[in-house]
Amino acid sequence: MLCWGNASYGQLGLGGIDEEIVLEPRKSDFFVNKKVRDVGCGLRHTVFVLDDGTVYTCGCNDLGQLGHEKSRKKPEQVVALDAQNIVAVSCGEAHTLALNDKGQVYAWGLDSDGQLGLQGSEECIRVPRNIKSLSDIQIVQVACGYYHSLALSKASEVFCWGQNKYGQLGLGIECQKQTSPQLIKSLLGIPFMQVAAGGAHSFVLTLSGAIFGWGRNKFGQLGLNDENDRYVPNLLKSLRSQKIVYICCGEDHTAALTKEGGVFTFGAGGYGQLGHNSTSHEINPRKVFELMGSIVTQIACGRQHTSAFVPSSGRIYSFGLGGNGQLGTGSTSNRKSPFTVKGNWFSYNGQCPQDIGSEDYFCVKRIFSGGDQSFSHYSSPQSCGPPDDFRRSDPSKQIWTVNEALIQKWLSYPSGRFPVEIANEIDGTFSSSGCLNGSFLAVSNDDHYRTGTRFSGVDMNAARLLFHRLIQPDHPQISQQVAASLEKNLIPKLTSSLPDVEALRFYLTLPECPLMSDCNNFTTIAIPFGTALVNLEKAPLKVLENWWSVLEPPLFLKIVELFKEVVVHLLKLYKIGIPPSERRIFNSFLHTALKVLEILHRVNERTGQLIQYDKFYIHEVQELIDIRNDYINWVQQQAYGVDVSHGITELADIPVTICTYPFVFDAQAKTTLLQTDAVLQMQMAIDQAHRQNVSSLFLPVIESVNPCLILVVRRENIVGDAMEVLRKTKNIDYKKPLKVIFVGEDAVDAGGVRKEFFLLIMRELLDPKYGMFRYYEDSRLIWFSDKTFEDSDLFHLIGVICGLAIYNFTIVDLHFPLALYKKLLKRKPSLDDLKELMPDVGRSMQQLLDYPEDDIEETFCLNFTITVENFGATEVKELVLNGADTAVNKQNRQEFVDAYVDYIFNKSVASLFDAFHAGFHKVCGGKVLLLFQPNELQAMVIGNTNYDWKELEKNTEYKGEYWAEHPTIKIFWEVFHELPLEKKKQFLLFLTGSDRIPILGMKSLKLVIQSTGGGESYLPVSHTCFNLLDLPKYTEKETLRCKLIQAIDHNEGFSLI
């Protein structure tokens, strides 16, 4: 051991020497053949811990700080600690803390401000005593200020006690001192790697390099850009991105070491202790310029000096106050910048010459500083081992984190047989949000040091793998312990406000734990976890949403699926029956799960759909609740102003309506909602008509009205007649049920006539003779024609007709692209829509965007124009102002494509589509419609192709002589199921007027087959309006096959009968 500095009280342990000041490193004979584990330096005393766990002290003992009454000039053993294996020590001005290998803390010395944590009344304690209030807590680090103390537990809890004159306890301004350890609750949840204390200021360092400081700040030693004391922990923002891995404090200054080996200092600089070649104080962290060319691996602070070790040269550098020789430079001069400590230093990596004697050179193992003294543990070049590197943490001094080594240790014990200490270790780890927040860090490329509001610093793949490795069926005791710790300790302690982004990580990682997905844990773990998440304050929730938004889609989906499963589980319980006494808690559970999904859905929409929107659909909803009743309840809640935007506690008294969370509804459920809404509006319109009719009996000025919207049309003038009636129709009448009457026909409209009307009028309106729509051969789709001579009223009528069809639950045959439905739902068409409508043009645009070279102008020769046909002639339209003079290049090609798409779908047809849009929404507008996705709305208007032919057979009804087991019916279905897909689709077209099925599926498509007279020579006949098939009584399978195929092959148009 080398030592230098103030020896006036014997604090260097050199024995009875004459000098009171040792100006340069001197060997201590006492430590020959002894290995030192740790050194603590007080103002006038020093404590040494040897590798065998014994403790020796020397120096001033006026206040009992040595823990013994022996010689003060040379190290003497503290016999009271003989039975303990001490692993670390720390010294205040005149008090000492010692930590044993069991995590217990012993204290002695001055106790004027309660800095020993013993809750005693004595001024000083001369023999070490155990701090009993910490005896049940496993402490891994201790740190002493002059009159206060800090401790870090294995569970990432920070305790403080002693003087609080300057706020150095971090407990607020109210208390002056604490005589027993107090938990700093404001830091709960943060994963810490170090605690440090200065004269009257304190620091904690997180695993990802964030620093929190509090206490005295007269000289800027907290680095917070001012000189105001802090009574609660404050984040040192300026160092967050610097990868700080170690921090140490002097009386009024602070030094921080980075992962790259840089050093920052701040605070008091009056003696040059900051190393910036000045005596100025620094209120912000500043890098020590003269050390920037070297990689520093160790730093230490004395009262008013600083030391740094550079392993590449093997040298120790020091700066600051030198009046007591503490710089080791051979003089008492102060140094304002790093200066080499005198000595024959030898680098561990250096080549050892044969002629170097072991007595002549020193290979540094570790440096220590405190008070006005400094020490260096060294070895000879011949026996030199690698020096300590403060950039690498000692696992024994760190908090619990879930890692491969720990899991391997836990799994190494046979199931049900691991010792109590292992159970305590598992319990401690999973009872602490700080420990979980320090687990699964993204260590590759030191990514976790970038933790912030946009990046979590977590390796989610590691979290998934380690959780699945830990939770295994053949180790049920571990799973039970983890579940119990989460349920009873971790989750109940969660709060809505969090001290830092690092305290949020477990909200990201815990859903990866298989226990969360176990339905047995839904009400005890998953839902309480969700409640804590939902109750987060706005700022931390926003950060969590940011983190979710950059997750890999499968990881994001995992969280969504978890809470969908919770919702389904709860709805199943509800269907079975919930006792009235449990209804309130059930409501809160269901609200919680749905609220979490709502937040996730918001994130998904904000990010442009991280996962497909339909991944939020809960398809079981239709089976588990009465959607119609749920919608009615929701409408009533809206009418009475019930607000479901507040916290879960308040929601417990509000019945859950799934309609409040419409993103969980699939297309079928939304269609049911729309139909329910339509029925309600129809009923309201009918009721209003009835009230008006009753009033007209007593008040002749009030005209009677029809409760239905009646359309009387002639087949030969169906468009003109319909337009005439609809032009005169009031908006409120569109909400009435539609009844259609064909002039000269007696049929009562029970739905079939209405269906026929829609089929006929849409066929007529889309006829090329009107020139309203342009037909695209490549895609077989139509779009609004900007060359039409028709009045916009006709487009308005088509919009009304489409709206009426939906409102009256009828499929219509429209060959529009998906872009139409996007625009109806206020979504922007994209290049994909252009590819659908105009495949060749769309492909060309994609080729333009994908072209890798820079010579786009020369290769494509394009400008911001579009060439269109105008009655046989071509016309050039500018897409932007001065488009003809604006060439398309690599920089603006995306703008060109966007402008092209905008012209086709928006600008060129704006007035026509606006008329269509107004007509459509006049009938069918409202909140429910906006719940649909474009492809869902398309499927509802024109049907879809999700065929289930067995379901069609199952739901078919029979009339006359037929029943399901009739021989003709049996061979009919045999023939039908043997038909190829295209023939089956032709059959649908033949029978229903469309080869597509309603969005509600085959179960909603009711076919009727009835027997007819005549022989087997007759063909089957379809009554399209009623989905009715007249089927002769065929007896031979082949005959039936031929006749059926003949009938559907010769079907033209809609085959209406």
Swiss-Prot record:
The active site is at C1025 (glycyl thioester intermediate). Signal peptide: none annotated. Keywords: Cytoplasm, Differentiation, Repeat, Spermatogenesis, Transferase, Ubl conjugation pathway. RCC1 repeats lie at residues 1-51, 52-101, 102-154, 156-207, 208-259, 261-311, 313-366. GO terms for biological process: cell differentiation; negative regulation of smoothened signaling pathway; protein ubiquitination; spermatogenesis; ubiquitin-dependent protein catabolic process. Its EC number is 2.3.2.26. GO terms for molecular function: ubiquitin protein ligase activity. It is found in: Cytoplasm, Cytosol. Pathway: Protein modification; protein ubiquitination. Its main location: cytoplasm. The keyword Transferase applies. It catalyses: S-ubiquitinyl-[E2 ubiquitin-conjugating enzyme]-L-cysteine + [acceptor protein]-L-lysine = [E2 ubiquitin-conjugating enzyme]-L-cysteine + N(6)-ubiquitinyl-[acceptor protein]-L-lysine. Residues 730-1057 form the HECT domain. Probable E3 ubiquitin-protein ligase involved in either protein trafficking or in the distribution of cellular structures. Required for spermatozoon maturation and fertility, and for the removal of the cytoplasmic droplet of the spermatozoon. E3 ubiquitin-protein ligases accept ubiquitin from an E2 ubiquitin-conjugating enzyme in the form of a thioester and then directly transfer it to targeted substrates. This is Probable E3 ubiquitin-protein ligase HERC4. It comes from Rattus norvegicus (Rat).
